[in-house]
UniProtKB/Swiss-Prot annotation:
Species name: Desulfitobacterium hafniense (strain Y51)
Binding site for Zn(2+): C183, C191, C194, C197
A GO MF label: ligase activity, forming carbon-nitrogen bonds
Keywords assigned by UniProt, alphabetized: ATP-binding, Ligase, Metal-binding, Nucleotide-binding, Queuosine biosynthesis, Zinc
GO biological process: queuosine biosynthetic process
Database matches in CDD domains: QueC-like
PANTHER family: 7-CYANO-7-DEAZAGUANINE SYNTHASE (PTHR42914:SF1)
Protein family according to the UniProt entry: Belongs to the QueC family.
Protein name: 7-cyano-7-deazaguanine synthase 1
Positions of ATP binding: F10, S11, G12, G13, I14, D15, S16, T17, V18, L19, L20
Length: 220
């Protein structure tokens, strides 16, 4: 299988966009894959993806899979099942869990990779807040795929790291964070209330602060 080729699960959010730039900086040939699994943010995500890829003039076209019926077997705020009486970002964050989402997405990406003879899959997971964003899960998924179809390397450089790591990479790679889209309540604009909007705004502020701090250091 192609050694320097990778299937990227791309959502147009900060994490997968920074991962896109990270992969490009390492000279990977990227095959972007976007999956519509019935998420409320589908339109905004796809619009952001198309803009980012157009600006980068990437070699390979985006493959978009429309599978909105997956929302019928899933649950949570991501597919419009909003919780009642939410009083904190932590409660909203917990409600956004779509059970088994990353296993589903990685399985589809692996199938696509098999067709293209690509043995690497990249996914922009950060930290370990959910079970399917941990290193343990990713390693188990590699083993499962090896038993199922072929050996794959799951590239997830930010797994297990705090978001600050992503922001530092975004600054280093000059990622246009404001071109990204992350909202779990609205279809094509940011609600500025959900956890994803909150995290995105916080990330942009940290990114700008990082730039100011480095500029101040360079003055000495």
């Amino acid at each position: 299988m192609g050694k320097n080729k990778v299937v990227l699960l791309f959502s147009g959010g900060i994490d997968s966009t920074v991962l896109l730039f990270w992969l490009l900086s390492r000279n990977y040939e990227i095959f972007p894959l976007f999956i519509n699994y019935g998420q409320k943010s589908y339109e905004g995500e796809l619009e952001a993806i198309n803009k980012i890829l157009k600006d980068l003039n990437t070699k390979n076209n985006l493959l978009t899979l429309n599978m909105p019926e997956l929302q019928l077997v899933g649950s949570g705020a991501l597919v419009g099942e909003y919780p009642k009486n939410i009083s904190s970002h932590n409660e909203w964050y917990a409600s956004e869990f779509f059970p088994n989402r990353n296993m589903i997405l990685l399985s589809i990406a692996a199938t696509y990779g098999y067709k293209l003879q690509i043995s690497k899959i990249a996914i922009g997971v950060v930290g370990d807040s959910y079970q399917d964003t941990t290193r343990t899960f990713l390693e188990a998924m590699e083993m499962t795929l090896a038993q199922s179809i072929a050996r794959y390397e799951l590239i997830a450089p930010f797994a297990g790291h705090p978001r600050q790591k992503v922001i530092e990479e975004a600054y280093r790679l000059q990622v246009p964070l404001k071109s990204t889209f992350s909202c779990n309540a609205m279809g094509n604009r940011h609600c500025l209330l959900c956890t994803s909007c909150y995290e995105r705004e916080k990330a942009i502020q940290l990114h700008e602060q990082c730039g100011k701090e480095r500029a101040e250091k360079s003055d000495f």
